[in-house]
Structures are given as C-alpha cells and as structure tokens.
Amino acid sequence: MAYTQSLKGRSFGFKDLKTLLARASPRRSADELAGLAAASEEERAVAQWALAELPLTIFLAEPLIPPEEDEVSRLILDSHDRTAFTPISAFTVGEFREWLLSDATSDADLAAARQGITPEMAAAVSKLMRNQDLIAVARRCAVTTRFRNTIGLPGRLSTRLQPNHPTDDPRGIAVSLLDGLLYGSGDAVIGINPATDSPEDVERLLHLLDEVIRRHEIPTQSCVLAHVTTTLELMRRGVPVDLVFQSIAGTEAANRSFGINLALLAEARDAALSLKRGALGDNLMYFETGQGSALSAEAHHGIDAQTCEARAYGVARAFSPLLVNTVVGFIGPEYLYDGKQIIRAGLEDHFCGKLLGLPMGCDVCYTNHAEADQNDMDNLMTLLAVAGCTYIMGVPGADDVMLAYQSTSFHDALYLRRVLGLRPAPEFEAWLNRMGIFDGRNALALGVPPRLHGAIHELTEGTP
C-alpha cells in the first residue's frame, strides 16, 4: 500500500510501509548505504508526520516481510497477544507515543501491554521520539530476570565482565577476570568471546570459568560466546554450560547467514534447561544484536536498520533470555557514522528492547575508524544508565585486545553507580561485601581483599 503526505502544496509519496519507516528514521549511514534514507530533512519530517497518523493495526495487516517467506515474521504475528493489544489497539502511532509519555499511563500499564506491542510498532513510535522521550519511557519499563542472581531490579546496574584474550591464554583471562571482580564487575555474566570456535578451546574456557565461580562461590553465571551449535555439542558432552549465547538478527535470511534458525535456538534452550544449573531461575539465553547486521548480510529486505534491529528483539523475546544487548557501534561507521548516530541508536535499541519486555543492556562501543571517541561513550553510557539500562560491559581499560574495539571499562560502571546511586545485583552486592571488595556502602574497600590473596598469589606464582 502506498502512502502520501502533502506539505505546502508539495506531495510526498512512499511506495509501501517499509519505505515510509525508512524515510522517517533519524539519519544514519546504514540506511544511506542501503539507499533507503530520506533525501532531505524535509522528506524525513514529512515521513514522520505521515507515520504518526497511521493506525497501529497497520503493522498487523501489512507485515514488512510476508510471513510465508520469513519465520521471524511468522513468529511476530503468531505470538502477538490480542488481549494485551486491546487497550492500545485504537491508537495511531502518534497517539501511541502520547500514551507512552503520559503521566496517566502507569508502569503496570506499560508492562501489561508488552506482549501486544510488535517490534515494528516499537520501532515506528521510536522514530517519532526525541532522545529524552526514549529515556523517559525506557526508565519506566523494569524487566527482571534470574539465573543465579536477580538482574534488572530498579536502582541496579549490572555489568558483563569481559576478560577476552587474543590467544585465549588461561592466565591472561584469569588476570582480567580477577581485575574485574576487584572492581565489582561481573554480576550480569562473566562472558568470554573465544578467539576460535574450537570445541576443545571453548570447553577449556568453560571449565576455567566454572572453577572460578565454584571456588569463590560467586553468585553469577558464565558464558563462552561460541556459536550455538558448538555450545550444543559441549552440553551433550556434559561440559558445564550456564548460559547459551547466540548473535541474532531480525530476518530469517540474516539469521541463516549466522548459521541459525528458530528451531535450533529452541533446541539449545531445551538442552540448557535440562542441565538445571540456575539456582534462582531459568532465564538462560544470552543474545547479542546490532543495527546493520541484516544489511551486512544483504538480508534486510529493504527494511531500515533500526526496524530490522527491533525485529531481532521479537526473536529474543520468544526465548525468555537472561540477557540481551545491542553491540551498538561495533560494525563501524558504514552503519553508524559518528558519535551522534551511535548515541541515538543506543537509546533507540534500549527503548525498543525494554518496551518489548527484554532485559536490555548495551555494549557501549565504537571502532577505531568511526568518528567517535570515549567522550561519546561517556555520554551514551550516562544516558543509558539514567534510562534504566540493565547492564553494560566491563573491559580492562575499555580496550578489547581480542576484538579490537573500544567499549566501557570496570571504572565506568563504578562511575555510573556512584553518580546515579545505582548498585549491583543484590546477591552479587552481598558477595562483594562479604569478600571485602566493597566496604558495605556500595564503594570499593581500600587495599587487597584478604580472601582473594590466594587467587592473586596463584596468578603471580603459577598457572591458575
């Protein structure tokens, strides 16, 4: 169906719904690369005007990719909760925005509507929102998950401890891991990106993390971010797997380029559930996403990068994950050119994820050839923390020596917790205090915690 909008006697045409969504998107290099972006700020404003007047029901009547061609579309439509949708079903996209921002809309109202909001509805309304709108609404969308601790409670900010090493050297990983723990990092997950996807190497890393967590009785979970098929094989061997990781995207074709489909994700989740390793809950999937992934696989179907990203959240939502995060600036300036675009994308992703009911975190990051620097990351992580972001990354010095990109450091989480009065997950916070890492006042204790002297001695004197 085509859409038109007139401004000062000039008519603007949009051939279909996905074209209208793309033209209404805030500027980003991914959409320009794909030839989908508005040709001018005037066209962008007109497209946003036209989008604001569309009924939300249009996204159910006109799927962006026909469900008979795409399993992600089928999942989104088949899992849509009509009862949850009823209170907002008469709204236009513009009225939906006003409802989200209204003081009359309670946090309970937002939570009740989650399963009635499709990813495309979330993406559409985000295109009409300023940054402060994205922050204000996301802050009210609390999403709590559990495995060995409780993540996502209001007033909490968790971190993924990311002790990557370019050769997967056990001592190098252990040093970074201990460094992170001494800064209060790791309550979301201790997660390693392996240098290779070799099952033997991944198994060795999983045993290393399991040993550290068990020896020190750390109330957290581990993950080696291997391909889901590798993790499945290792679970069959009896290797200690806490969380199952996989990168996901918003179209069937993009997921196929990752070597996955929905059935494979379901198989992996069932296998992990059968291990019964969670002490507090059974949220055990960990997904990473990022704007531009479908475009980079030539699998975007003419859909803009941000809407494709929101569709990935529809995939994630089906598997009740413990953690989901956008790796916002990782693909590079071809997709998000500069700090301004990275900041906007991070806020959009967090908003859409939280609105859809996901435990949404963010890898606040950029590549060295982007027009961005650490000050931009300071801005984004602060805005996200104000917005109630579930977790960020903890990388030694913010410089990942294996993935060769810039993220956030252990110190960054301490800064955010200090200036905004945020705390780690409650079980992990209690462990930090018990170990003498924290001083009982949500701050680092002075000196080396006596209970970790042995671990430090092992790293300096022998192989961990």
Each language-model region and where it sits:
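Anaerobic metallocofactor- and corrinoid-dependent redox/one-carbon enzyme cores
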Residues: 2-176, 182, 187-464
